[in-house]
Design a protein with these regions (language model features):
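A broad, low-specificity signal marking well-ordered, structured residues that form hydrophobic/aromatic
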Residues: 53, 180-181, 255-256
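Short, glycine/acidic-enriched capping/hinge loops at junctions between secondary-structure elements
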Residues: 68, 194-196, 268-269
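Extended catalytic/binding region for NAD+/ADP-ribose chemistry, centered on the ART fold
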Residues: 247-268
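Non-catalytic interaction/regulatory modules that flank or connect domains
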Residues: 163-252
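Tandem repeat scaffolds
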Residues: 2-178, 191
């Protein structure tokens, strides 16, 4: 089962601007409705024809924006802290790497948004409309009611890419010395994926171990995380530290995998 990435998603992984510090001079601190409205009016007036008004790098704190129309704006790398965003409509906005802290997000609309790398940790997600949204690499760990969001067939990266249950599939991982492990995930294995191309399972059978160019075959491979954990051809393997059932806890116990061979190689060799 191959993964289908857009070029923008690949670029987002390779060069995520969230890892670069924002200069203090670029930050805009908005802590009242009046300050927010004044800034919004200014950027709307300054936006070139066809361009999104620039609300990037804003620190928006303690403002009641419930039910507001904030569609078609560029909020990349902004922070909403302690705001009332109940029913706020961000549809069509650029929301990459937005951080949400201590807000009311219930019934918020992110329809058609590019919302990669957002943090929803500890937020109540009840009624958030993600129809048509791309939430690649967004953090839903420790959020509340992640299953009560609204999605549709155009929502990207909310649903798991692997079979959810009752179906076997092939998975891949890259071990020490770039040994590539081909694994069978049986139909009775627990499996989960969050909002990226990686996942975790509770059990695998090692089918084949090769070099990245597939010219060499090996009988074993060593884990890159636990030097005492080995994958051996023909053997059933279970994680030494158990399996975390919460799909949103991405970096947690389980056998981690990719669905695409080249993706696991790129991840390990980047």
């Amino acid at each position: 089962m191959a993964m289908n990435f857009t070029s923008s998603e690949i670029d987002f992984v390779k060069d995520n601007e969230a890892y670069r510090p924002i200069p203090e001079s670029d930050k805009r601190r908005l802590e009242s409705a009046e300050a927010f409205d004044a800034e919004l009016e200014k950027v709307r007036g300054a936006a070139a024809a066809g361009a999104m008004p620039d609300m990037r790098h804003c620190i928006i704190k303690g403002i009641d924006l419930a039910g507001r129309d904030l569609t078609g704006l560029d909020f990349r790398r902004s922070t909403f802290d302690g705001c009332n965003l109940h029913g706020t409509d961000f549809s069509g906005s650029q929301m990459d790497n937005v951080a949400f802290y201590n807000n009311d997000l219930t019934d918020m609309k992110l329809c058609g948004c590019t919302a990669r790398g957002c943090s929803f940790r500890f937020q109540d997600m009840t009624g958030i409309d993600l129809s048509g949204a791309n939430i690649y690499s967004s953090v839903l760990e420790d959020a509340l009611n992640q299953d009560k969001v609204i999605i549709d067939d155009e929502t990207k990266w909310y649903k798991m890419r692997c079979p959810e249950e009752g179906e076997a599939f092939i998975a891949w991982k890259c071990c020490t010395d770039l040994r590539v492990v081909m694994m069978l995930v049986p139909k009775d294995a627990h499996r989960c994926m969050a909002t990226m191309e990686t996942g975790r399972v509770s059990k695998v059978k090692v089918l084949k171990i090769t070099s990245i160019d597939e010219k060499e075959n090996y009988t074993w491979a060593q884990s890159t995380v636990d030097p005492d954990f080995y994958y051996e051809v023909g053997k059933w393997i279970e994680p030494a530290n158990g399996f975390q059932m919460d799909r949103w806890k991405d970096s947690s116990p389980g056998i981690h995998f990719f669905l695409d061979r080249q993706q696991c190689i790129d991840y390990q060799s980047k």
